[in-house]
Each structure stands twice: as C-alpha cells, then as structure tokens.
Amino acid sequence: MIKNIGVDQIEVDRIAKVVDRGDGFARKVLTDREFAQYQDLTHKRKIEYLGGRFAIKEAFSKAWGTGIGQAVSFEDVETLRTESGAPVTTSRIFTGRIFSSIAHDDHEIVAVVVLEEPAGWRRAIGKLLHLLSGRKK
C-alpha cells in the first residue's frame, strides 16, 4: 500500500553555481557512497547527479511529511546508480519500498519518490496498539 508521494524540482543553474564553488555542498548533501560516485563524473554530470540526489532527498522528506530537518536528514536517504544508470533509493529511517525517478533537461531537475509501506505494516501496528492498550478481545 502506498504511504505517500513526494515531488521536488530544482533549477539546473542553482546547482551549477554550487558545483562551481567546490565540493562543500556536495559533501553536505551526499552520503559517502553517493560522493564516491559523484567524484568520478564530468562537470555536466556532477550538476545532474548532485541536483538529482538533492531533489530525491527533498522529495523523500515531503513524502515523509516533514521536509529536511530534524526528522529527515540528507544522510537518511541514499540514491545510487545501477550499472544501467537507474537510481536505486534506500533509507535508514524507512523500511518499506522506495520508488524513485529523476528527470532533467537543460533548465530543470525533477524527482519523484513513492513510499510503499512494508507488507503487513498496518496489521502489525494494529496488533501492537491492541496489546499496549491492555484491552481484551
């Protein structure tokens, strides 16, 4: 069952400016494994990669319902490339499935994240709440 959906959009020019200033923003936003992939890219691909990862993390935080901050940090969400280049997103704070997509052109980068609850999640929470309430069937 779908828990929530998040979408984020960012201008390529904004990301290009931070890439041109060095690796500070990339180190803040990317996990160590994401940064390792980022380092090997051309300048143009660095802009697309960093913008895409930033947008995915923002979209995840919107799907989570909080935005980036205390509940969701940049380190909580990681998106790595597969051999084919497709993004695979994981999170250390969400155990369900994460579906993600990144699209970009010369002007905009857009990311969409869909969070799917773990199988049986609602039933398990219901049972736990029932047990904690001390009510008998």
Curated annotation (Swiss-Prot):
The keyword Lipid metabolism applies. Mg(2+) binds at residues 8, 58. Its main location: cytoplasm. Its EC number is 2.7.8.7. Transmembrane segments: none annotated. It catalyses: apo-[ACP] + CoA = holo-[ACP] + adenosine 3',5'-bisphosphate + H(+). One of its GO terms (biological process) is fatty acid biosynthetic process. One of its GO terms (molecular function) is magnesium ion binding. Pfam families: ACPS. It is found in: Cytoplasm. It comes from the Bacteria. Its cofactor is Mg(2+). Keywords: Cytoplasm, Fatty acid biosynthesis, Fatty acid metabolism, Lipid biosynthesis, Lipid metabolism, Magnesium, Metal-binding, Transferase. One of its GO terms (cellular component) is cytoplasm. Belongs to the P-Pant transferase superfamily. AcpS family. Transfers the 4'-phosphopantetheine moiety from coenzyme A to a Ser of acyl-carrier-protein. This is Holo-[acyl-carrier-protein] synthase. It comes from Lactobacillus delbrueckii subsp. bulgaricus (strain ATCC 11842 / DSM 20081 / BCRC 10696 / JCM 1002 / NBRC 13953 / NCIMB 11778 / NCTC 12712 / WDCM 00102 / Lb 14). The gene is acpS.
